[in-house]
Amino acid sequence: MMKKNHITRTIIASAVLFSFNAAAATSYFEARNDAMGGTGVASSHYGVAPLANPALLTKHNSNDDFSLLLPSVGAQVADPDDVSNKADDVKDDWDLFDSAVDNQHGVQQAAANLKHRLQEFRNINADAQVGVSAVAAMANDTLPFALMVKSYGTVSVNGKVNDADLDYLDKVANGTITDVDKNALTSRAFGRAAVITDVGISFAKELETAGQKWSLGVTPKYQRVDLFNYNVTVRDYDKDDFDGDKYHNTKNGFNADIGAYTDLNDNWTVGLV
């Protein structure tokens, strides 16, 4: 949406200031900034400035007065190992093994099947990031401001299979172990997630020092952090429990983002958050 035809070169340095719970400076999805390689600290349109650098609220054209971003939604998912289905398969074979041991029927075959499933589940991983945001910005030459709402989440799921479990199941399968102790199996499934939600108001002011114009912006905001730490043995795995109260912790607080930017010339912009 910027009308300049030249290529904007950017120098970016970032740090989280007044952080209640540190989060990456690019903890949002916005098509233009993503297409530019995440250089939004120095190149954002004023309408998304609160997401990247509140100082950029002053970087508007003379005919700009209002901008509404409603909403910006994005997601990235990496699951090459099909973790969810494989975790379900492990759980299904565990239940069959559990039943076989209790009934003393088909134990060796059930142990062999469970070992195979655990081998497939070994060291697999899935990751995902999801974000949604909305911004309403008012452009003016005195004190541009904006209302910002943003939520960003990241999830990681993986399995940890112990070699001792594979050896134990192998011995059960070949008949070396006949008195089976189900508690001897300790392989685990892990699910971790964090969701950070911000609600804030951004302000910016253009200043001048020794003839060099620059802008300072601030976004005081309320922040909620939801943490999930799902850590269970494969025998207790249930994907519906991932967001249960037992594994969920919430924190609330207030913090602020502070940013600055200046145009060194027509081709160079420096941004700092």
Label every model-predicted segment:
Residues A25-V273:
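Subset of outer-membrane beta-barrel
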Residues M1-A24:
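Gram-negative bacterial Sec-dependent N-terminal signal peptides
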